[in-house]
């Protein structure tokens, strides 16, 4: 394959993890994002400051499931969806929106221009109560500035919670929030 040829489109695929109880459909044409590619991408497009790089090293845990619209490395902001799982710990008993209220101020410290577009609110995902927030900021990668819209869902489930994040360009030129929403609509937590 030469650089001018597009990567072969991957077929749609249902991804199931019975151990943690989640199922989601990767759309046709989207790609699995490996843990290594995810970490490389975080380092490449994140702020160059020391605090961000330390946060990547500390919190850049590999997602349990991750999809991107384009094969990495990709020269622009690659629309993506990532699913992580975290222990509830001291957050036990809190709603998804309450957890978001705790998480977002830390994120705002990493991005000086971060703007909350949709404040944390309760919603439902895959039959589970969840919190949702949408925010925008600028990622910088070398000489590039990438105006970004991120969406974050927190789904509490017992002693842990799912953290589902998605990102697109603000102008949606190479991928849309509607595409992300179509993936979100396939998530299922009731696998029994």
Q: What kind of feature is each model-predicted range?
A:
Residues 1-77, 87-89, 101-102, 106-128, ...:
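N-terminal targeting sequences that direct proteins away from the cytosol to non-cytosolic compartments
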Residues 151-152:
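Extracellular C-type lectin-like domains
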Residues 79-81:
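Beta-strand acidic-aromatic groove motif in beta-rich domains, primarily in extracellular
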């Amino acid at each position: 394959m030469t650089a001018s040829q597009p990567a072969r489109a991957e077929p749609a695929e249902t991804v199931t993890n019975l151990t943690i109880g989640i199922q989601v459909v990767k759309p046709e044409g989207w790609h699995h994002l490996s843990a290594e590619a995810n970490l490389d991408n975080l380092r490449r497009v994140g702020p160059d400051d020391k605090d961000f790089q330390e946060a990547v090293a500390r919190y850049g845990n590999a997602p349990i499931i991750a999809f991107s619209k384009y094969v990495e490395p990709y020269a622009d902001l690659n629309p993506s969806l990532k699913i992580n799982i975290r222990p509830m710990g001291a957050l036990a008993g809190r709603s998804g929106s309450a957890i978001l209220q705790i998480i977002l101020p830390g994120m705002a410290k990493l991005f000086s221009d971060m703007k909350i577009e949709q404040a944390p609110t309760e919603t439902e995902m895959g039959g589970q109560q969840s919190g949702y927030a949408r925010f925008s900021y600028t990622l910088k990668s070398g000489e590039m500035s990438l105006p970004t819209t991120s969406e974050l869902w927190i789904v509490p489930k017992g002693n842990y919670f799912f953290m589902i994040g998605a990102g697109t360009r603000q102008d949606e030129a190479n991928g849309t929030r509607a595409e992300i929403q179509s993936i979100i609509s396939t998530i299922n937590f009731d696998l029994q």
